[in-house]
């Protein structure tokens, strides 16, 4: 059972915005940034400004302090909770509220997932006038220690006593003074203070703005963004730290293409998809899902929805390093993966060979944000599509499918599984697929890839007769 915040001894007052008092507000809902939303009512009972209150939950009565005022709304921070919600729980992290890494630790996990499901449904309806024929059961898993990828900012702050390593403070460019993190794997959380001490000793302490974290099944990699070369003393310190904490250091002197392993050289990052007998090597700068446990469940769900058969030809768009392509190749006759990055395309090809499915796969590098109907026709007929775009969505792909459907010139897949990390672009693309390409939205559901944040990942199934 969730631990509720003790009831405040202060009482709500109808004169809540009298001089010297913090105004009182009843919270009706949460927005997409996990802020409580309420509306001021004037003395005549007429609705007034909308107030977005950080730290407030639906059903609560709170006092608040506004830090930004606009003609139709205000942004505020909660001051006191006069009537707490049954959904409120005690945050696990000592730095919650200051650190910007999480925004929902004060909200019960079941309520977090329910709110994300509502955000998905609201986006589909308000942006595309769509309701899914079925809402899938949410995909969820461990809510702590799940974040296998992270970008940590490094900054020397004399007033704070030295080097800080961590996420930014909430809505700030400052680095949170954090000594642990509940959503990072425990061994990484325990490394934050030693990392601060390490950077403090380096000659390039003030020329190393960030550390990129990537955790694999057996290896933890730390990519140091170095604006100046390291010296021999730095090298010795890095080697000692790597041996002590069992990590691998990579150095990035310029752009992403300059990333190279420093020490040890023989370690290899990978993750596995045991259900399909897949081992997926990757580099720390490759795109991989943040939450490995949820990714396994997501891949299984996506393939069951797509239901590839032995004779099927499947197109995997935005395929990355082959996260869906390789499992699909275990089940279908042929899978074609298209990706916009040359490096990821090459890695997908290597991974297909590593897993013995190169005979059932082929890969190509294309700009999928500019793909046309003619481009899709040139690829030939496919029985099914899997689409897993970045936050920008798959607008060009959706438009191309709509054009093919309306012209009647070219084959269309009977089934599309769309994995999304942005409910608004999913809704936009779903509108095109349903209203212009003739598909039905058979089902949709949320994937709680990022517990304790407002980030909404989702999956949707489209079918066409």
Curated annotation (Swiss-Prot):
CDD domains: AdoMet_MTases (cd02440). It comes from Burkholderia mallei (strain ATCC 23344). It holds the Pfam family tRNA_U5-meth_tr. Residues 1-24 are annotated as: Disordered. [4Fe-4S] cluster binds at residues 93, 99, 102, 181. S-adenosyl-L-methionine binds at residues 289, 318, 323, 339, 367, 388. The lineage of its organism: Bacteria, Pseudomonadati, Pseudomonadota, Betaproteobacteria, Burkholderiales. The keyword S-adenosyl-L-methionine applies. NCBIfam families: PRK13168.1. This is 23S rRNA (uracil(1939)-C(5))-methyltransferase RlmD. It catalyses: uridine(1939) in 23S rRNA + S-adenosyl-L-methionine = 5-methyluridine(1939) in 23S rRNA + S-adenosyl-L-homocysteine + H(+). Catalyzes the formation of 5-methyl-uridine at position 1939 (m5U1939) in 23S rRNA. It is an enzyme of class 2 (transferase). Its EC number is 2.1.1.190. GO terms for biological process: rRNA base methylation. HAMAP family: 23SrRNA_methyltr_RlmD.
């Amino acid at each position: 059972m969730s631990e509720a915040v003790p009831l405040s001894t202060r009482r709500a007052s109808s004169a809540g915005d009298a001089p010297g008092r913090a105004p009182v507000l009843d919270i009706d809902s949460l927005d997409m940034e996990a802020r409580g939303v309420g509306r001021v009512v004037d003395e005549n009972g007429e609705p007034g400004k909308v107030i977005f209150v950080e730290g407030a939950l639906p059903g609560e009565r709170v006092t608040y302090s506004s830090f930004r005022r606009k003609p139709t709304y205000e942004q505020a921070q909660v001051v006191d909770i006069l009537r707490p919600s049954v959904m409120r729980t005690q945050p696990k992290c000592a730095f919650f509220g200051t650190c910007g890494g999480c925004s929902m630790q004060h909200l019960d996990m079941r309520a977090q997932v329910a709110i994300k499901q509502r955000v998905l449904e609201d986006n589909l309806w308000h942006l595309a006038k769509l309701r899914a024929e079925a809402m899938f059961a949410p995909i969820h898993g461990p809510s702590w220690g799940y974040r296998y990828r992270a970008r940590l900012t490094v900054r020397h702050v004399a007033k704070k006593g030295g080097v800080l390593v961590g996420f930014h403070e909430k809505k700030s460019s400052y680095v949170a003074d954090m000594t642990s993190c509940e959503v990072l794997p425990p061994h990484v959380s325990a490394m934050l203070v030693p990392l601060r001490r390490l950077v403090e000793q380096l000659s390039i302490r003030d020329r190393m703005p960030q550390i990129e974290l990537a955790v694999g099944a057996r290896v933890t990699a730390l990519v140091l963004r170095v604006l100046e070369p390291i010296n021999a003393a730095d090298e010795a310190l890095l080697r000692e730290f790597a041996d002590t904490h069992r990590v691998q250091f990579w150095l990035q002197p310029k752009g992403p293409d300059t990333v190279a392993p420093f020490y040890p050289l023989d370690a290899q990052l990978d993750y596995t998809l045991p259900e399909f007998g897949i081992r997926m090597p990757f580099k720390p700068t490759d795109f991989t899902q943040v939450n490995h446990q949820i990714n396994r469940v997501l891949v299984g769900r996506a393939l069951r929805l797509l239901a590839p058969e032995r004779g099927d030809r499947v197109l995997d768009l935005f395929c990355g390093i082959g996260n869906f392509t390789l499992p699909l190749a275990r089940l279908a006759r042929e899978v074609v993966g298209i990706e916009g990055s040359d490096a990821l395309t090459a890695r997908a090809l290597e991974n297909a060979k590593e897993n013995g499915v190169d005979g059932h796969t082929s890969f190509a590098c294309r700009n999928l944000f500019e793909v046309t109907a003619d481009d899709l026709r040139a690829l030939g007929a496919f029985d099914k599509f899997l689409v897993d775009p970045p936050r920008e969505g798959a607008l060009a792909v959706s438009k191309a499918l709509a054009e093919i459907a309306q012209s009647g010139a070219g084959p269309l897949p009977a089934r599309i599984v769309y994995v999304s990390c942005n409910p608004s672009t999913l809704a936009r693309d779903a509108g095109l697929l349903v209203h212009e390409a003739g598909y039905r939205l058979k089902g949709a559901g949320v994937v709680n890839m990022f517990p304790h944040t407002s980030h909404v990942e989702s999956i949707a199934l489209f079918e066409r007769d």
